[in-house]
Curated annotation (Swiss-Prot):
Top-level taxon of origin: Eukaryota
Protein name: Ribosome maturation protein SBDS
Main location: cytoplasm
Keyword field contains Transport: no
Organism: Caenorhabditis elegans
Single GO biological process annotation from the record: cytosolic ribosome assembly
Gene: sbds-1
UniProt key word Nucleus: yes
InterPro entries, alphabetized: Ribosome_mat_SBDS_CS, Ribosome_mat_SBDS_N_sf, Sdo1/SBDS, Sdo1/SBDS-like, SDO1/SBDS_C, SDO1/SBDS_central, Sdo1/SBDS_central_sf, SDO1/SBDS_N
Assembly behavior: Associates with the 60S ribosomal subunit.
Keyword field: Cytoplasm, Cytoskeleton, Nucleus, Ribosome biogenesis
Described purpose of this protein according to its UniProt entry: Required for the assembly of mature ribosomes and ribosome biogenesis. Together with K10C3.5b/EFL1, triggers the GTP-dependent release of ribosome maturation factors from 60S pre-ribosomes in the cytoplasm, thereby activating ribosomes for translation competence by allowing 80S ribosome assembly. Required for normal levels of protein synthesis. May play a role in cellular stress resistance. May play a role in cellular response to DNA damage. May play a role in cell proliferation.
NCBIfam families xref list: RNA_SBDS
Family to which the UniProt record says this protein belongs: Belongs to the SDO1/SBDS family.
Length: 253
């Protein structure tokens, strides 16, 4: 005679989940989410709670399917509405990540930083790009530590000075064209030249000024402010190239 095996009423087994955990009043509360959706919810790229939560249920242990008791929820959160409690845990709880998942995420983040750095730098001697794989290897060898509270761009900028200790790299320069009307041209000319690292065109025509050259990326804001303020909006600043490079990657063995 066959027998039906039933899951106890205080258990609900889920699989392939991302668990978010919160501890309050000495008790553990967990929610079951779809993988990769917790981060999307927290950065507001996902606004549909049902795309994030697998169930509007609070657990004491997701992996064992054990549900939290009503009295424990009220004692910890002051409410018994499980959806509202799920939202609190989703916003403020700790996302549980396995060591394998953590390592995979770290590797991916490091790769993103390496690609960003590769888009920002060149070899100072050849002016050629440096392959992301070379940068990635150098970051790993120096045990560069990623910081979860900083963006990939911030971490790329943090890493560049350290990479200079082992790699021949420098920030790639921007190519800029500036046009200044006759009235302000003479008074602005000297100030402009101090912001260019290399001037390719310094042309006067009917009293107006045109300059083309290379600047450090960090000088762009100062140059933009100078042109805007000194000419009261009549000057023109044009970006010809965000990264002045010789075509083709530099191969480093």
């Amino acid at each position: 005679m066959s027998k039906n095996i039933k899951t106890p009423t205080n258990q609900k087994v889920l699989t392939n989940v991302a668990v978010v955990r919160m501890k309050k009043t000495g008790k553990r509360f967990e929610i079951a989410c779809y993988k990769n959706k917790v981060v999307n919810w927290r950065n507001k790229s996902e606004k549909d709670i049902d795309e994030v939560l697998q169930t509007h249920t609070v657990f004491s242990n997701v992996s064992k399917g054990q549900l939290s008791k009503k009295e424990e929820l009220i004692a910890a959160f002051g409410i018994e509405d499980q959806l509202e409690i799920c939202k609190i845990i989703l916003d403020k709880g700790d996302l549980q990540v396995s060591e394998k998942e953590r390592q995979a995420a770290s590797d991916q983040s490091l790769k993103e930083v390496s690609q960003l750095i590769a888009s920002m730098v060149v070899n100072p001697e050849t002016k050629r790009p440096v392959p992301p794989s070379v940068i990635d290897k150098a970051l790993q060898e120096m045990h560069f530590s990623l910081k979860p509270n900083r963006s990939s761009k911030q971490q790329a900028l943090d890493a560049i000075p350290k990479l200079r200790e082992t790699l021949k790299i420098e920030r790639a320069k921007m190519k800029i064209r500036v046009a200044i009307p006759t009235k302000e041209a003479k008074s602005v000319h000297t100030k402009l030249k101090t912001l260019f690292s290399d001037v390719e065109v310094d042309d006067w025509q009917d009293g107006s000024l045109e300059m083309v050259g290379l600047i450090e990326p960090g000088s762009f804001r100062a140059l933009d402010d100078l042109v805007r303020n000194e000419t009261k909006g009549h000057g023109r600043l044009e970006i010809l190239s965000l990264k002045d490079v010789v075509e083709g990657e530099l191969q480093i063995s």
